[in-house]
């Protein structure tokens, strides 16, 4: 039924399923990570520091996205997605062992970076896989993930 509703062609079936699943897990990890980030931060710091954290996130994202854009130009987006996924996993594992003091605000900012980068890279990869005509049919299904 979904195949006929979205007019998914046989060659598109596997990429659509993988991207649907991937987006589901990105959203799941983002929601879970943000809740955990907020809880850990608010246990150790007063809520009045949250606006400062939002500012740090914005400044950090401007710097990192500019750096990423310069260094990723002309590179394989899927490979970059895999590499950043490995880096994110290793750093999250490291935070488990050092999550105290100044590492808590750093963790707050880092979770937001991971969330934004994961979504951004997902759509860059997805845009490389499908042309604009396919995207009009398929993206609504993928977004439902």
Give the ranges of each region predicted by the language model.
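Short, Lys/Arg-rich, polar N-terminal cytosolic tail immediately upstream
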Residues: 1-11
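Pair of pore-lining "gating" transmembrane helices in MFS-fold secondary transporters
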Residues: 9-40, 109-110
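Hydrophobic core of transmembrane alpha-helices in multi-pass small-molecule transporters
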Residues: 20, 24, 102-121
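Intracellular juxtamembrane helix-capping segments at the cytosolic ends
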Residues: 36-37, 115-131
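Loop-to-transmembrane helix entry/capping segments in MFS-fold secondary transporters
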Residues: 47-48, 132-142
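Central cavity-lining transmembrane alpha-helices of secondary-active solute carriers
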Residues: 51-71
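Cytoplasmic membrane-interface "Motif A"-like loop-to-helix N-cap segments
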Residues: 73-86
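C-terminal ends and interior cores of transmembrane alpha-helices
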Residues: 86-103
């Amino acid at each position: 039924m979904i195949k006929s509703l979205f007019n998914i062609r046989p060659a598109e079936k596997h990429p659509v399923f993988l991207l649907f699943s991937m987006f589901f897990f990105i959203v799941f990890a983002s929601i879970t990570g943000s809740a955990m980030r907020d809880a850990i931060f608010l246990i150790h710091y007063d809520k009045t520091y949250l606006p400062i954290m939002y500012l740090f996130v914005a400044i950090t994202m401007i710097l990192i996205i500019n750096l990423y854009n310069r260094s990723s130009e002309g590179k394989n987006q899927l490979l970059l997605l895999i590499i950043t996924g490995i880096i994110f996993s290793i750093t999250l594992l490291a935070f488990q062992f050092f999550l105290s003091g100044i590492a808590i605000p750093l963790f707050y900012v880092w979770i937001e970076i991971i969330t934004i980068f994961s979504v951004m890279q997902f759509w860059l990869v997805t845009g490389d896989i499908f042309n604009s005509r396919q995207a009009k049919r398929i993206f609504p299904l993928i977004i439902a993930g």
